[in-house]
Amino acid sequence: MTFTELSTDLLADPVALLMSSFFTASNSSKAAGQAYIERLKLRVTDRDAPVSMMAAGAQLAAIREWGSISSADRYATLPRIHQRILIVHGSKDIVVIPINAFLLAQHLPDAQLVMYPDASHGAQSQHAEVFLQHARLFLDG
């Protein structure tokens, strides 16, 4: 399934949408998704504001604009970024397909790509413990 193939029924149910777009259909991924949902419920103070429809629309517009730029132009300025960058991605991401993470890593001179197996758009939540290890190694390096 791709992100654009998600049904309108899922769009009406935020938890179902999150589970379908951030986690895969495997039992281990579904279990990680449920654990993530439970972790979200634990924090009751100092929570981020929910994403507004306006913010979601602006993000989709930015994605569309990025996609309308020719491939050559899309990556032209990335080699000028010399900041260390950690790219975290799921091997089965349906929101941003994995090849895009590889392309990004190829065009950024100091990027490190970590691809998590059997993970969709919520790779860092599905593999939370190992992600924290990778993040610490990156930040300490």
Task: State the predicted function of each range.
Residues 102, 108-141:
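Catalytic active-site module of serine/aspartate enzymes centered on a nucleophile-bearing elbow/loop
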Residues 72-80:
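The feature captures the conserved acid-bearing segment of alpha/beta-hydrolase catalytic domains
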Residues 17, 39, 58-62, 76, ...:
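Alpha-helical elements of Rossmann-like donor-binding domains used by nucleotide-donor carbohydrate transfer enzymes
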Residues 81, 87-89, 93:
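Short beta-strand/loop motif that positions the catalytic acidic residue
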Residues 82-83, 110:
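Active-site acidic short loop of glycosyltransferases
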Residues 94-100:
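Conserved alpha/beta-hydrolase "acid-adjacent" motif
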Residues 1-13:
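Flexible "cap/lid" loop of the alpha/beta hydrolase fold
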